[in-house]
């Protein structure tokens, strides 16, 4: 089973956690070109393109200016992203065996680096999928990466057993030819809902936390089959057989009213 997670907007370049090995990103040349083009934008342009406040725009202007410098600090991707999902994965207590297993069974999307393994060394950046780069062809990041990533992604899923546990946000499908992915491998997309006033509701923070907890559960317990995936339970979330189907696994918290 291969897990797919979305990258986070927040990143760090400092960690005390040691990993058994580090690797180069598979698309580091493309990432370098993306970062080079991003470095041509002014602070004001980054503020508009990234939809951020001036402080964050300045921070990322500096990041892109330093991206190609030898002294710029790097971290393994799984430690570099610091959003809610990654806090719940909590790789800080992973064993060497956990990291090695994750390297083969987890992939992270990235608008800058394309597709990452957990131990791929990356530099801090911020980028959105709808940003258009002048070269080549003024395309969005989705259009840029789709023809590059799809074959590699499918090959990685097949190598990991032919089943994808898609815990990424919906927009990340745009980085791949998703119809091809669904045609060539089995895709399971877990959903997490709470009952509120007798109806199912989606709470974003719970969804993010649950995605991280499920990723941790799969990696720590070496989950390989879709049946084993149904055993995931956390903070009242349990598999709901009635609401699920072959491609959508629904986990609900609480009871109907």
UniProtKB/Swiss-Prot annotation:
Assigned GO CC terms: cytosol
Membrane-traversing stretches: none
Any GO BP annotation: response to hydroperoxide
Intrachain disulfide bonds: none
Similarity section: Belongs to the UPF0246 family.
Protein name: UPF0246 protein BF3795
Species this chain originates from: Bacteroides fragilis (strain ATCC 25285 / DSM 2151 / CCUG 4856 / JCM 11019 / LMG 10263 / NCTC 9343 / Onslow / VPI 2553 / EN-2)
